[in-house]
Amino acid sequence: MVTKLSSTSAAGSLAHSPALARVREAGLVLAGTLSLILIGQITIPLPFTPVPITMGTFAALAVGAVLGSRRGALSALLLGALAAVGAPVLHGWKGGAIVTFGYVVGYVLIALIAGRAATVWSRHSGSMASRVATGVALMLLASASVYVPGLIW
């Protein structure tokens, strides 16, 4: 006798279990945080300020756009939490509330806006030129949002 596996079988129900969904979500947030850490190590030092240009802003944009607002923001929050407790996750493998920590706070804003921008862009029903203009405007807003907490810090 041959038994067919159906979508109600143990394997099928495991694939759609809430526990597995939580593991997947946690894995995506961890991958986003790891991306922020590694890409944020790429820096361009400036002679007139202790704050270098880093690829962290780009990473926050990318993580927010790819993972969505919620997961992107959680990835940035996890990065901030790790840095706040002293883990060496910031540029130059530094940790703590250093001079650039305000920009890390801004990464949460960037991820939220970039995730929303990606959603709006994908659902925009106008012409391609209109979609590109909307996407560029929202990504520029996201990029600029890092400077508010960064400069205040």
Summary of predicted features, one role per range:
Residues 2-73:
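Hydrophobic transmembrane alpha-helices
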Residues 5, 43-55, 80-85, 119-133:
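Hydrophobic alpha-helical transmembrane segments
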Residues 31, 58-60, 102, 110, ...:
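A general structural signal for well-ordered alpha-helical segments in protein cores
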Residues 74-83, 138-139:
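Central hydrophobic cores of alpha-helical transmembrane segments
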Residues 2-17, 24, 38, 93-148:
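Short helix-perturbing small/polar motifs within transmembrane alpha-helices
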Residues 35, 39, 43, 63, ...:
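Alpha-helical membrane-inserting segments
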Residues 41-52, 80-111:
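Interfacial aromatic-anchored transmembrane helix boundaries in multi-pass membrane proteins
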